[in-house]
């Protein structure tokens, strides 16, 4: 990107390669000049990152990948292969929660926004059809927004960043409908917590369950490639 965007307002979009973040990118492109930001953080399945690279390329946006070794800490089924990804619903915060992940990701996005002069950060957190992660709640986003006002040059100078959460109060079905309206090709996306090397989904984890149900409720054919059972 070389530090330059076009003439439209600028935004950093967190892009995992999954359904929600890809919908966010399409939504953001209708409003902003976008840079997509992804993370290699030691996640169990890296095919989502392959998907993110392809999605960003097809969308024609600059894409940066940040390397962080959260697997060195473990503490989650997504970063520790000794912890199984559950295939049944769990009470409380599930073992697929990665400690402080959104805080870490948003902090990098905040730095990128300052460096590249972005006015907004777009993240696909959702508090309706989600797995119960504490860093996907409205009060978390508000708290991070308040922190960013205090911790950044832009905030101190009276030009605080906007944190856009277009999916926050949408059901998975309505997220899919929004993406379809913006031309999203969901066959490119990978949502599964334990997708195989070809990006095929297990069809059993919580992320797969929410995704499957979303397509059913949206009345849209599910383009997901599943591992043969």
Curated annotation (Swiss-Prot):
Pathway: Purine metabolism; 7-cyano-7-deazaguanine biosynthesis. SUPFAM superfamilies: Adenine nucleotide alpha hydrolases-like. It is an enzyme of class 6 (ligase). It catalyses: 7-carboxy-7-deazaguanine + NH4(+) + ATP = 7-cyano-7-deazaguanine + ADP + phosphate + H2O + H(+). It comes from the Bacteria. Its cofactor is Zn(2+). Its EC number is 6.3.4.20. GO terms for molecular function: ATP binding; ligase activity, forming carbon-nitrogen bonds; zinc ion binding. Binds 1 zinc ion per subunit. GO terms for biological process: queuosine biosynthetic process. Zn(2+) binds at residues 192, 202, 205, 208. Keywords: ATP-binding, Ligase, Metal-binding, Nucleotide-binding, Queuosine biosynthesis, Zinc. InterPro entries: QueC, Rossmann-like_a/b/a_fold. Signal peptide: none annotated. ATP binds at residues 15-25. Belongs to the QueC family. Catalyzes the ATP-dependent conversion of 7-carboxy-7-deazaguanine (CDG) to 7-cyano-7-deazaguanine (preQ(0)). This is 7-cyano-7-deazaguanine synthase. The lineage of its organism: Bacteria, Pseudomonadati, Pseudomonadota, Gammaproteobacteria, Moraxellales.
């Amino acid at each position: 990107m070389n530090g330059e965007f076009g003439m439209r307002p600028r935004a950093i979009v967190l892009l995992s390669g999954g359904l929600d973040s890809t919908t966010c990118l399409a939504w953001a492109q209708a409003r902003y000049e976008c840079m997509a930001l992804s993370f290699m953080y030691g996640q169990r399945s890296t095919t989502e990152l392959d998907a993110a690279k392809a999605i960003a390329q097809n969308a024609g946006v600059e894409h940066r990948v940040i390397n962080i070794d959260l697997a060195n800490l473990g503490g989650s089924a997504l970063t520790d292969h000794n912890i199984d990804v559950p295939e049944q619903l769990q009470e409380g915060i599930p073992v697929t929660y990665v400690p402080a992940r959104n805080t870490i990701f948003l902090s990098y996005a905040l730095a990128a926004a300052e460096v590249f002069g972005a006015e907004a950060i777009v993240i696909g957190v959702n508090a309706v059809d989600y797995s119960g992660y504490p860093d996907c709640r409205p009060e978390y986003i508000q708290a991070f927004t308040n922190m960013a006002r205090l911790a950044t040059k832009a905030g101190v100078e009276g030009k605080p960043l906007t944190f856009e959460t277009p999916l926050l109060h949408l059901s998975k079905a309505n997220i899919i409908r929004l993406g379809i309206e913006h031309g999203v090709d969901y066959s490119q996306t990978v949502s599964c917590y334990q997708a195989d090397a070809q990006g095929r989904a297990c069809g059993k984890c919580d992320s797969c369950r929410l995704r499957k149900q979303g397509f059913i409720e949206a009345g849209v054919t599910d383009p997901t490639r599943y591992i043969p059972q």
